[in-house]
Design a protein with these regions (language model features):
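Aromatic side chains
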Residues: 12-13, 71, 195
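C-terminal nucleotide
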Residues: 24, 29-189, 201
Length: 201
């Protein structure tokens, strides 16, 4: 089901998306995924009790129209970083090696690509800590890491608004309002591919 969903987005809608959202939707619940082998990702449903908490996916009202190029730039730029390391995906790149060769990566792929890679490498490590927090029943730590991931996405992945349309930032505003409402008691972050659309609270 997930691969069919990815095909529909790639071919029918022309969006060069990966498989993460489709795998999460087809599996259901909280899901751990590892894409070290893109042809056979590891998918494990997490058994976490979250009493008193609700996951809300909020429509920010932002429009995705005309933003395919902004979205497509992410895998294209990350691909340039991967090629430098002889990797198919960033999950196959060791973080220490990436930072050791950072000047080379900047020359090969550009600063925005390097910042985006920093987000992905950080999120790969952050996911392990999120799973550990859930397994330990430490939901406060899990929420903190969700917010940390969201800030990394905004600052380094740069997928909350498109540089070609800075006047309209519905998702940025939605995230600011979510932080105002939930700070100290909840978590929030961009959801999906970004550039408008939804946030998860």
């Amino acid at each position: 089901i997930a691969r069919m969903g990815q095909w529909a987005e790639n071919v029918y809608f022309g969006k060069p998306c990966g498989l993460m959202d489709q795998l999460a939707s087809s599996t259901g619940g909280l899901v751990f995924m590892d894409f070290r082998d893109p042809a056979a990702p590891l998918v494990r449903r997490l058994d976490a009790a979250l009493p008193g908490y609700v996951l809300c996916v909020v429509d920010s009202g932002a429009d995705h129209a005309g933003l395919t190029d902004a979205y497509a730039a992410i895998p294209r730029e990350l691909g340039a970083v991967c090629r430098l390391f002889g990797a198919e995906v960033l999950r196959q790149v060791e973080e220490a090696e990436f930072y050791r060769r950072l000047p080379e990566a900047r020359r090969a792929a550009g600063d925005r690509a390097v910042l985006r890679a920093i987000h992905f490498l950080g999120d790969n490590e952050r996911v392990s800590r999120q799973v550990a927090a859930l397994n330990a029943g430490d939901f406060d730590e899990f929420k903190r890491l969700v917010v940390e991931s969201g800030h990394s996405s905004f600052e380094y992945l740069q997928n909350v608004y498109a540089a070609c349309d800075v006047e309209f930032q519905g998702l940025s505003l939605a995230l600011a309002l979510a932080q105002r409402a939930l700070d100290g008691c909840g978590a929030w972050r961009v959801h999906g591919g970004g550039f408008g659309g939804t946030r998860a609270n």
